[in-house]
Amino acid sequence: MKYDTSELCDIYHEEVNVVEPLFSNFGGRTSFGGQITTVKCFEDNGLLFELLEENGRGRVLVIDGGGSVRRALINAELARLATQNEWEGIVVYGAVRQVDDLEEMDIGIQAMAAIPVGAASESIGESDIRVNFGGVTFFSGDHLYADNTGIILSEDPLDIE
């Protein structure tokens, strides 16, 4: 489904929170949305492998990487896993790598930057917790909508039709 965050903000301006404009699109799908699952991990993507093995239909993974752009949390292998398990998208408060591969995949990926250095894989982190970045607080179960213009968050699903 295609989302227009500008239009959604016009319609639901009192029901949505707008994430600060820190992110760029890196995935092949420039518009995505769904119910979020949160994870907090700093320069370590081991926990992401476990989460992205789950069925992701209708879901968006929101990763609080502490804003670090020293190591990439998402790479082509993780993006392929997410695509295979039908995740709608991934938002990374941090960095990604292998961007040429990412843009060929049918998944939405927004991150702060790209860097060739990969993350550790020791599974250090927590999932399904409250995370804060971009001027908003994300809870697992909230709904996120993203496109080239920005990212918005709502407690409840928005009527897109």
From Swiss-Prot:
GO terms for cellular component: cytosol. Gene3D superfamilies: Ribonuclease E inhibitor RraA/RraA-like. GO terms for molecular function: endoribonuclease inhibitor activity; enzyme binding. Its main location: cytoplasm. GO terms for biological process: negative regulation of RNA catabolic process. CDD domains: RraA_family. The keyword Cell wall biogenesis/degradation does not apply. InterPro entries: RraA (IPR010203), RraA/RraA-like (IPR005493), RraA/RraA-like_sf (IPR036704), RraA_gpbac (IPR014339). It holds the Pfam family RraA-like. Keywords: Cytoplasm. It is found in: Cytoplasm. HAMAP family: RraA. Belongs to the RraA family. Globally modulates RNA abundance by binding to RNase E (Rne) and regulating its endonucleolytic activity. Can modulate Rne action in a substrate-dependent manner by altering the composition of the degradosome. Modulates RNA-binding and helicase activities of the degradosome. NCBIfam families: NOT-MenG, PRK09372.1, RraA_entero. Homotrimer. Binds to both RNA-binding sites in the C-terminal region of Rne and to RhlB. This is Regulator of ribonuclease activity A. It comes from Serratia proteamaculans (strain 568).
